[in-house]
């Protein structure tokens, strides 16, 4: 284990850093100027169809510049994980991840079976949305995040802060106090910039009894929702910061519970104050988020499973990985998406695939989401 940890610094960890570096620095040419990958991906939420479509095409073109190098990263990280799981006596990388997650295989299989059973419901929603936007062959990928209803309201950082504090004071003052502390003590890196990673995450600094949060804030409700999610992680950190160091670790399925609970509460509070086009937007946004947490997460799980299996027999070139991703999307999204406009490069931009220490960084989101929905339902009853 000591040797594996030492060699990892120039092995899996180095390949992971390469993926992060390339996706955060790749030059994205959009309408005559260069922007970051995070900025062009944020345009998927634009209310303008032409903007969403051109941003999607620009994003796809940008990946072509880095696809081969990142394919090397993915292959060698997965090869290292497979080798170490065998040396440690696990039947597979998934078996090792399940032990890390403190989850039984039967639990995972039951959840995936339930997800598979409900895929037709999500596909019906996607086809309906596609029809509302004028499409006849399913929803094209560039309209997957298209807002419906009125979606032009934006929040400054100060407005987002006050909105979150007011909303969560009604849930628990302890959560609201932590949110105020995070904003006022500058725990949050808000805006996208050159060289910054996409997406969002929260890291605990337990020795300081603080957390640090990264987002790519654009001012829309979705970004406020992301802040609520990440601050949920910070709240989880606050609950365990006084525990002994060996008791501060927790499995990924549980890690997504407080964060998703926050999203559920914020969404319900926002919908209670809305009506008409604004309510339509919030309702559709909630279904859209559930689609990501269930359908897209399932596609990521299928993709990673196939990559682990196939990478043991051959090196997977970028074209191989693109085909595996398309196959996974077709199995999950089905006829809900336009088969001529999917996203073969979703393996390039998602850093979750490139963790050498935690594989299958996908199904915990589905579990945390479903668990949090159940907890919130119980909370309302009580």
Task: List each model region and its residues.
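Short pre-active-site segment immediately N-terminal to the catalytic Zn-binding motif
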Residues: 152-157, 206-228
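C-terminal, non-catalytic "cap/extension" segments appended to globular domains
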Residues: 1, 27, 102, 131, ...
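Active-site recognition of the HExxH zinc-binding catalytic motif
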Residues: 89, 218-240, 259, 264, ...
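Post-HExxH zinc-binding segment in Zn-dependent metallohydrolases
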Residues: 251-278, 285-292, 368
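Catalytic zinc-binding patch centered on the HExxH motif and its immediate surroundings
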Residues: 153-155, 188-210
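His/Asp/Glu-rich acidic catalytic environments and adjacent acidic regulatory segments
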Residues: 1-106, 110, 114-117, 163-175, ...
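Conserved binding/catalytic microenvironments
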Residues: 215, 222, 230, 245-252
């Amino acid at each position: 284990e000591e040797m594996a940890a030492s060699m990892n610094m120039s092995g899996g960890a180095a390949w992971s850093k390469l993926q992060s570096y390339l996706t955060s620095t790749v030059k994205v040419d959009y309408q005559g100027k260069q922007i970051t990958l995070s900025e062009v991906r944020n345009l998927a939420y634009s209310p303008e169809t032409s903007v969403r479509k051109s941003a999607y095409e620009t994003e796809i073109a940008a990946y072509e510049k880095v696809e081969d190098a990142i394919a090397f990263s993915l292959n060698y990280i997965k090869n290292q994980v497979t080798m170490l799981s065998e040396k440690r006596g696990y039947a597979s990388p998934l078996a090792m991840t399940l032990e890390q997650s403190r989850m039984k295989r039967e639990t995972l299989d039951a959840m995936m079976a339930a997800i598979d059973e409900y895929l037709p419901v999500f596909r019906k929603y996607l086809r309906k949305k596609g029809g509302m936007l004028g499409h006849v062959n399913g929803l094209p990928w560039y309209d997957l995040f298209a807002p419906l209803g009125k979606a032009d309201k934006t929040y400054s950082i100060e407005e987002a802060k006050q909105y979150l504090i007011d909303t969560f004071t009604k849930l628990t003052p302890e959560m609201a106090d932590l949110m105020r502390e995070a904003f006022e003590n500058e725990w949050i890196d808000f805006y996208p910039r050159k060289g910054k990673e996409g997406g969002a995450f929260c890291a605990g600094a337990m020795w300081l009894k603080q957390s640090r949060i990264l987002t790519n804030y654009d001012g829309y409700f979705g970004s406020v929702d992301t802040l609520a999610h990440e601050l949920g992680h910070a709240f989880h950190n606050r609950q365990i910061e006084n525990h002994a160091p060996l008791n501060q670790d927790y499995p990924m399925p549980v890690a997504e519970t407080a964060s998703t609970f926050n999203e559920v509460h914020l969404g319900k509070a926002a919908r209670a104050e809305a009506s008409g086009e604004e309510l339509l937007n919030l309702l559709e946004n909630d279904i859209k988020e559930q689609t990501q947490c269930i359908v897209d997460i399932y596609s990521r799980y299928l993709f990673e499973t196939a990559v682990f299996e196939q990478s043991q027999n051959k090196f997977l070139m970028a074209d191989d990985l693109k085909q595996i991703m398309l196959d996974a999307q077709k199995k999950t999204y089905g006829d809900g998406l336009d088969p001529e406009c999917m996203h073969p490069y979703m393996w390039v931009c998602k850093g979750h695939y490139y963790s050498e220490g935690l594989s299958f960084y996908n199904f915990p989101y589905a579990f945390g989401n479903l668990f949090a929905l159940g907890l919130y339902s119980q909370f309302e009853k009580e």
